Regions:
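Conserved beta-strand-loop-beta-strand hairpin that lines the nucleotide-binding pocket
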Residues: 1-14, 59-139
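STAS-typified acidic loop motif
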Residues: 14-26
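Short coil/turn residues that cap or connect secondary-structure elements
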Residues: 19, 35, 39-42, 62, ...
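Histidine-centered phosphotransfer motif of kinases
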Residues: 46-64
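Conserved short strand/loop->alpha-helix "switch" segment adjacent to the catalytic nucleotide/phosphoryl-transfer site
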Residues: 28-52
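Short, structured helix-loop boundary elements
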Residues: 21-24, 44, 110
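A generic secondary-structure signal
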Residues: 3, 33-37, 57
Length: 139
């Protein structure tokens, strides 16, 4: 997915949140409620889980002391059959999708994002990065 496709799409929500653990809950709730209000409830749960994982990664890996901000954008990507979740933060280091042992308690976030989305990726943005995931919906 090209960055321009996301920018040209109708934005459903745009949030600026503090880099603290409580932002995970706020972002997840907004995404779920927004998709429900726009008649896209069938993907609301998956989008909320993806949002939780991406925001949690931003809080844990990019925000350190909580001073940084996290951006969350939800768009109807170019056609009615897709929705894109984008989470941006101030850390330029790209996400590290790693294999986690079966008994591991952490490190599965990007595996979950990959499993629930059509595709995902990231780009550099304003000294940080943006991580996106595209969800397909039945229309």
């Amino acid at each position: 997915m090209a960055r321009t496709a996301t920018q040209a799409s109708p934005r459903l929500i745009a949030l600026a949140l503090p880099g603290i653990p409580g932002s995970v809950t706020v972002a997840r709730r907004h995404v779920r409620e927004t998709l429900g209000l726009h008649g896209m409830g069938e993907i609301a749960q998956d989008a909320a889980i993806i949002t939780s994982e991406l925001v949690a990664n931003a809080v844990q890996h990019a925000c350190g002391n909580g001073a940084a901000r996290i951006g969350v954008t939800l768009t109807a990507a170019g056609n009615p059959a897709a929705v894109t979740v984008v989470v941006s933060d101030s850390c330029p280091q790209g996400p590290d999708r790693r294999e986690t042992p079966a008994d591991g308690e952490q490190g599965r976030g990007l595996q979950i994002v990959e499993a629930l989305s059509v595709h995902w990726g990231w780009w550099y943005e304003d000294g940080g990065k943006a991580v996106f995931a595209v969800l397909a919906r039945e229309v």
